[in-house]
């Protein structure tokens, strides 16, 4: 991120604790325990949590929400690419139900600890979300086929596999009341392609503030070097 808002966050201010009952490191996030994987040391947790705080600053290109695009009371959230689950945890009191998709076993352990107080309304799916269904992958459409709830908010942040996720939710995308927070910086053409796709699907959308330089894609980086971070879409 190339903006002054970064200066408001310092990893040295973060206090990392260890839960004696399970050995997992955690930080207090808005009065709730946010657990991290047990392979993270103290400094790694601090760096990670500081990055998460910075990402969700209102001026950040990576911020999922805005003043006009929010999580509402009794929303049903599909958190696609949940990792540590900070987005769901931030809004857990409002949410009617949340589905966390996370394949990594270490992160699943951390998620189970984080959401233990709300386990009656949290479902953890240990698969990648994609455009096919097999032992390791699942599509949004097939997952929802036999579920009693209907999603009202879908957050998609999956390290470049966003297009596959969209391809696997052709039925879900037609829901009349749906909000989507969709990352667009992982691949060079994502913003242009996804904004067009969502427009064709009947969504109104806005881009997040500013731009990002995605350092993980330096080998294939082409002009324009700076990318829009996120699309917020709703019907």
Over which residues does each language-model region extend?
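A short acidic, amphipathic alpha-helical/loop segment
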Residues: 90, 94, 113-114, 165-172, ...
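S-adenosyl-L-methionine
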Residues: 1-94, 99-148, 192, ...
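Conserved beta-strand signature within the Rossmann-like core of class I S-adenosyl-L-methionine
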Residues: 154, 176-185
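Glycine-rich phosphate-binding loop signature in dinucleotide/nucleotide-binding domains
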Residues: 71, 143-151, 175
């Amino acid at each position: 991120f190339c903006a002054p808002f970064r200066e408001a966050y310092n990893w040295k201010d973060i206090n990392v604790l260890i839960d004696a009952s399970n050995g997992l490191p955690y930080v207090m996030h808005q009065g709730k325990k946010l657990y991290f994987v047990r392979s993270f040391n103290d400094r790694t947790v601090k760096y990670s949590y500081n990055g998460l705080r910075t990402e969700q600053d209102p001026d950040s290109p990576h911020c999922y929400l805005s003043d006009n695009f929010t999580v509402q009371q009794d929303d049903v959230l599909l958190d696609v690419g949940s990792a540590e689950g900070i987005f769901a945890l931030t809004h857990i009191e409002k949410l009617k139900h949340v589905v966390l998709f996370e394949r990594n076993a270490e992160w699943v352990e951390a998620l189970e600890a984080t959401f233990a107080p709300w386990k009656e309304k949290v479902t953890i799916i240990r698969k990648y979300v994609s455009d096919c269904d097999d032992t390791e992958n699942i599509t949004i459409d097939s997952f929802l086929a036999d579920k009693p709830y209907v999603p009202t908010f879908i957050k998609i942040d999956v390290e470049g596999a966003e297009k596959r996720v969209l391809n696997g939710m052709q039925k879900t995308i037609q829901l009349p009341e749906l909000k989507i927070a969709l990352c667009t910086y992982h691949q060079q053409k994502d913003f242009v392609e996804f904004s067009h796709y969502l427009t064709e699907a009947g969504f109104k959308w806005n881009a997040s503030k500013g731009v990002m330089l995605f350092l993980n894609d330096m080998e294939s980086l082409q002009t324009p070097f700076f990318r829009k971070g996120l699309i917020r879409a709703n019907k």
